Regions:
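Structural preference for solvent-exposed beta-strand-turn elements
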Residues: 1-368
Length: 368
């Protein structure tokens, strides 16, 4: 049976979309494979790592019929990458193997039974379906994902909190030193739901989401989240645990406010970061009416000083930050202007977008 017969670029694109979670070698060997299921004239591709399952369906010609098998995902992708994008390729069945043909090339690959592939059992308790544009969720993830913890023993910090309530979707991430919050409007009103998506899920979704038109549909259950977009279905387990009360962390009523160009501040921080200590990455901000001075030094007694002219008439403030935390936030914003709010040199700082309440970034000061 010819399972599919089409151009290299069509097959490769579909395989790459589902194979980001696949490891070349796995303690469960079949999880290094992609499940290929032919039903009529449609071909369905499924991958899993037991935490995440990704599935997509494509029309790739070939014989009409029913067939299923699993084959090494990375091997298949590596072979296809060596062929021209307009090369006609065919995948055929041959007893317990599959044969991939392209031009004068022929590759015979081992398979494992489709019935042995561990499909995720979907939760019966999913809430209502709601949606936002694909690009909106991609932007929200970009605004907060950098603040996720990495391998923190507080496992609930190694991911992003999704909160759906009313007609608002809010995303929050924190590693205990900084916190990023971003929100957008939903298409319908929903009851309050909170889930924590694992770090790996977030990274994979950022890879898959595009700026293309179209929406992403979401559903949450107690132990799973499901996303449907661009012909793909993405099911993931959730992180258990109680996320910190982010509303208590976000400061209110700072008396000192500065609005300045995001790119100018980013460039200043990137320059002064060069001479920070490799270990602590500290920069010192001196803020006074009309001037923001950024300074850094290191163990070799080298020093960098840079200044920005600002429209500011508040208190004189000296405060230290991990420069990486500031650069991360500014690099993941797209707006021209940013607002910095401070109380004094010992309290957390708040970055927002002027006239926009959908993004907030809190960063703790550090002693320098």
């Amino acid at each position: 049976m010819i399972v599919m017969k089409t151009t290299q670029d069509k097959v490769l694109s579909v395989l790459q979309s589902v194979s980001g979670i696949v490891e070349r070698r796995h303690t469960v060997p079949i999880l290094a494979n992609v499940l290929i299921r032919k039903t009529g004239d449609s071909v369905q591709f499924t991958t899993s790592d037991l935490e995440i399952q990704i599935r997509t369906t494509a029309e790739l010609e070939g014989d009409v019929g029913n067939f299923a098998t699993t084959v090494g995902a990375r091997k298949l992708i590596d072979i296809l990458r060596t062929m021209p994008s307009d090369q006609m390729v065919a995948l055929e069945t041959s007893q317990n193997k599959v044969i991939l043909r392209g031009g004068k090339s022929k590759f015979t690959l081992q398979t494992m039974p489709a019935e042995d592939f561990p499909l995720v059992q979907e939760s019966p308790g999913f809430g209502p379906v709601f949606s936002v544009p694909q690009k909106t969720l991609k932007d929200l993830l970009g605004q907060v994902a950098f603040a996720m913890a990495v391998h923190d023993i507080r496992y609930y910090l190694n991911g992003i909190l999704f909160v759906a309530e009313g007609k608002q979707l809010s995303l929050v991430a924190t590693d205990g030193h900084r916190l990023a919050f971003a929100s957008a409007l939903l298409d319908i009103e929903v009851p309050r739901q909170e889930v924590i998506l694992p770090r790996k899920t977030v990274i994979e979704m950022q890879r898959l989401l595009s700026d293309a038109e179209g929406v992403i549909e979401m559903q949450f259950a107690n132990n799973q989240a499901k996303f449907s977009f661009g012909g793909m279905e993405f099911v993931t387990k959730l992180v258990e645990g109680k996320f910190p009360d982010y509303n208590r962390v976000i400061p209110k009523n700072h008396k000192n406010r500065i609005t300045l160009g995001r790119l100018a501040l980013l460039a200043t921080l990137q320059r002064t970061a060069i001479l920070t200590s490799d270990k602590f990455k500290g920069v010192r901000l001196n803020i006074e009416p009309g001037t923001l001075r950024v300074a850094s030094n290191n163990a070799e007694q080298e020093e960098a000083v840079d200044e920005l002219d600002i429209d500011y008439a508040g208190d004189n403030i000296e405060i230290g930050f991990n420069v990486t935390y500031l650069i991360d936030a500014l690099s993941n914003m797209s707006q021209e202007m940013v607002k910095l709010e401070l109380s004094d040199g010992n309290s957390s700082a708040l970055f927002t977008i002027p006239e926009n309440a959908t993004f907030k970034y809190v960063v703790m000061p550090m002693r320098i």
